[in-house]
């Protein structure tokens, strides 16, 4: 059983650390929080400042909870939610591979699936969940991580995502060269 606990610890530290770094970059990287807010606005998630702050706090908090192994399925659900929003609002239209122009959905999909797996796996014996006697492993943990995350993302997208309309092609008479 130690192999499962080792896997849970490695996944929690890797995923939690990555999500913390992502949230930290929202707040303190390049354009800082105002730059993140402008980026949210540019992909149609409005108001940008509210969502930049919300995403930053969610990623920092969920990442810390994962590292500690505290409320693991709920922390995983928070990560699933933020990644599903990123997938739908920005990455899906760019194809699968992250190296493609516009960055495809490969990265956010993997973070989402690892989060779901960690929800199913639970925090493991070396977690604060274990110390507190909190455990929701298996299908129940997976359901919490996946369904709460997807549900939260769907709610956010339904209420706050307003992408710019796609440009319609010019009528044939306007695009054809004059004779």
Residue ranges and their predicted role:
Residues 36-44:
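Membrane-embedded helical hairpins/re-entrant loop segments and their flanking transmembrane helices
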Residues 1-31, 35, 49, 72-179:
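Extended, low-polarity transmembrane helix blocks
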Residues 68-70:
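Alpha-helix C-terminal capping segments
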Residues 43-53:
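Short, amphipathic, aromatic/basic-enriched membrane-interface segments that mark the entry/exit
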Residues 57-66:
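Hydrophobic, membrane-inserted alpha-helices
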Residues 51-58, 78:
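Physicochemical signature of membrane-embedded alpha-helices that form the seven-helix bundle of GPCRs
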């Amino acid at each position: 059983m130690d192999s499962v606990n080792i896997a849970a610890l490695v996944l929690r530290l890797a995923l939690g650390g990555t999500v913390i770094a992502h949230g930290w970059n929202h707040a303190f990287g390049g354009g800082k929080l105002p730059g993140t807010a402008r980026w949210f606005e540019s992909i149609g998630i409005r108001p940008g400042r509210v969502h930049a702050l919300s995403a930053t706090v969610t990623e920092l908090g969920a990442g810390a909870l994962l590292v500690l192994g505290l409320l693991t399925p709920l922390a995983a659900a928070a990560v699933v939610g933020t990644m599903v929003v990123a997938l739908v609002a920005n990455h899906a239209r760019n194809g699968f591979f992250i190296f493609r122009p516009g960055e495809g959905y490969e990265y956010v999909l993997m973070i989402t699936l690892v989060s779901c797996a960690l929800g199913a796996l639970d925090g493991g014996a070396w977690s604060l969940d274990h110390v507190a006697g909190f455990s929701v492993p298996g299908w129940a943990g997976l359901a919490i991580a996946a369904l709460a995350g997807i549900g939260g993302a769907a709610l956010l997208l339904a209420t706050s995502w307003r992408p710019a309309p796609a440009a319609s092609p010019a009528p044939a008479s306007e695009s054809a060269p004059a004779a």
